[in-house]
Amino acid sequence: MAIPKLQAYALPESHDIPQNKVDWAFEPQRAALLIHDMQDYFVSFWGENCPMMEQVIANIAALRDYCKQHNIPVYYTAQPKEQSDEDRALLNDMWGPGLTRSPEQQKVVDRLTPDADDTVLVKWRYSAFHRSPLEQMLKESGRNQLIITGVYAHIGCMTTATDAFMRDIKPFMVADALADFSRDEHLMSLKYVAGRSGRVVMTEELLPAPIPASKAALREVILPLLDESDEPFDDDNLIDYGLDSVRMMALAARWRKVHGDIDFVMLAKNPTIDAWWKLLSREVK
């Protein structure tokens, strides 16, 4: 009845993306980001320090950072810690008391904590649209594309994508920014959405050109990722200015598309703008 303990698996890669029936172009000025149910409770079923979930969180963080930089609204769904039997209704039959048994795990995972200008929607059923103002908020802001990330791919994420489609909102399911009970169920959800209700993409498809054109451009990429109000010098340690490991992993994933040897360890070894520009400005081989 309850969610079982979950095992990590290989996240989908570009060659795993099913044939999309639609070829919708991603339009940032028409899009919104949904971070679906990334609460401690739902993520905890993979255990602590799960590399797969670290990558999923890093990919979501990269998308969120991009959205913040481009004035794309960010929405979260989160189940409440208190849910009456009337509110849960048939969910009790299918999943038992769920999160209500572990109210201390209700918050969104630390590395994706919502900002004050984000919208957190109370989640009551599989679809993020059920008993929520999401459709109205999207349409009032002129948004008709929804980037879907989070857990679980074949339950709430797939249902939300299909519900969005039926409301004339174009869903973009981000294959490597989702997680599921198993790889088979993850891939099933992608196949369904690609063929029935949306477009399936990889994180990298929604992000801009991966390599900054200059050291100044690199600085513009880095500054929004820092917690400190003071700007670092080019040789300052960026970790001292609040750059965390999740954002560093996301940067490594983006830059590795051009320089295949770049990884988290390489960036963390010398986390300065000078050192990173030296890595990025190398001739591509």
Swiss-Prot record:
Activity-pH behavior: Optimum pH is between 6.5 and 7.5. At pH 5.5, EntB retains 50% of isochorismatase activity.
GO cellular component terms, semicolon-separated: cytosol; plasma membrane
Annotated localization: Cytoplasm
Carrier domain segment(s): 209-284
Species name: Escherichia coli (strain K12)
Any one Gene Ontology molecular-function term assigned to this protein's record: isochorismatase activity
Pathway(s) annotated for this protein in UniProt: Siderophore biosynthesis; enterobactin biosynthesis
Annotated spans, Isochorismatase: 2-213
Protein name: Enterobactin synthase component B
Residues annotated to bind Mg(2+): D227, G242, D244
GO BP terms, alphabetized: enterobactin biosynthetic process
Induction and repression of expression: Under conditions of iron deficiency and by the fur protein.
Keyword terms of this UniProt record: Cytoplasm, Enterobactin biosynthesis, Hydrolase, Ligase, Magnesium, Metal-binding, Multifunctional enzyme, Phosphopantetheine, Phosphoprotein
Activity modulation: Inhibited by 3-[(carboxyethenyl)oxy]-6-hydroxy-1-benzoic acid and 3-[(carboxyethenyl)oxy]benzoic acid.
CDD domains, sorted: isochorismatase
Family: In the N-terminal section; belongs to the isochorismatase family.
Effect the entry attributes to changing D263R: The catalytic efficiency is the same as the wild-type, but a 3-fold decrease of the affinity for the S-dihydroxybenzoyltransferase EntE is observed
Quaternary structure note: Proteins EntB, EntD, EntE, and EntF form a multienzyme complex called enterobactin synthase. Homodimer. Also forms a specific pairwise interaction with EntC; this interaction likely facilitates substrate channeling to connect the EntB and EntC active sites.
Catalysed reactions, as listed in the record: 3 2,3-dihydroxybenzoate + 3 L-serine + 6 ATP = enterobactin + 6 AMP + 6 diphosphate + 4 H(+); isochorismate + H2O = (2S,3S)-2,3-dihydroxy-2,3-dihydrobenzoate + pyruvate
Post-translational modification: 4'-phosphopantetheine is transferred from CoA to a specific serine of apo-EntB by EntD. Holo-EntB so formed is then acylated with 2,3-dihydroxybenzoate in a reaction catalyzed by EntE.
Effect seen on changing A268Q: Unable to recognize EntE and EntF. Exhibits a decrease in the enterobactin production compared to the wild-type. Still able to be phosphopantetheinylated
Modified residues (O-(pantetheine 4'-phosphoryl)serine): S245
EC numbers, comma separated: 6.3.2.14, 3.3.2.1
Cofactor(s) of this protein: Mg(2+)
Effect of substituting K269A: Behaves similarly to the wild-type
Cross-referenced InterPro entries: ACP-like_sf, Isochorismatase, Isochorismatase-like_dom, Isochorismatase-like_hydrls, Isochorismatase-like_sf, PP-bd_ACP
Function of the molecule: Involved in the biosynthesis of the siderophore enterobactin (enterochelin), which is a macrocyclic trimeric lactone of N-(2,3-dihydroxybenzoyl)-serine. The serine trilactone serves as a scaffolding for the three catechol functionalities that provide hexadentate coordination for the tightly ligated iron(3+) atoms. EntB is a bifunctional protein that serves as an isochorismate lyase and an aryl carrier protein (ArCP). Catalyzes the conversion of isochorismate to 2,3-dihydro-2,3-dihydroxybenzoate (2,3-diDHB), the precursor of 2,3-dihydroxybenzoate (DHB).
